[in-house]
Amino acid sequence: MFIINNNTFIAFANYYNSQKRNSVQSTVFKWSGGHFVKVQSLQTYGAWDVKSFQINGHTFLAFANYKSGRKFTTDSFIFKWNGNKFDLFQSIPTRGARALYPFVIRGQTFLGVANYFGDSQRFNTKSVVYQASGSRFVIYQEIPTQAASDITSFEYKGDTYLAVSTYSNGQKYNTNSALYKWM
């Protein structure tokens, strides 16, 4: 859930439709009259995750698109609220994106993306940290990962960390996840 101008919204990332196709509409609902009302559908491709965040008073929705058809190398989408609805702000290249997490360090907004695997369906890939730079997100850092399934950031004793969970290395599921310290 997120709030825009004292209105409560909720967004859902939809993975596939009743025909099991992953070119689907993910949905945004607004609280009105004691219940949520659908206000917008947004094109996504096997959306696995959605996060809302703000930059300088502007509200954004980011969707982690897992796959388009049989292709795991597909863009994920960042939408921006225009005062009435969400418009596509930017497409970012991802590889089987399973999760994303916006975070702020020293006033700079970043978006971490956990990539599961690319079109070769190999678990070794790179997850990406994007940085908001002017009117777009740019790649700040690529992190080697194996089937990354989630990503988050947290602060501890004045330091910022990025945690990336790993689902599998392609041979076993008892794997090590990674913790990175911001330098």
Residues covered by each model-derived region:
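Repeat-based blade/solenoid architectures
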Residues: S41-K51, S91-Y101, E142-T152
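Structural signature of eukaryotic scaffold interfaces centered on beta-propeller domains
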Residues: M1-N6, K51-G57, Y101-G107, T152-G158
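Beta-strand initiation motifs
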Residues: S32-K38, N84-L88, G134-I139
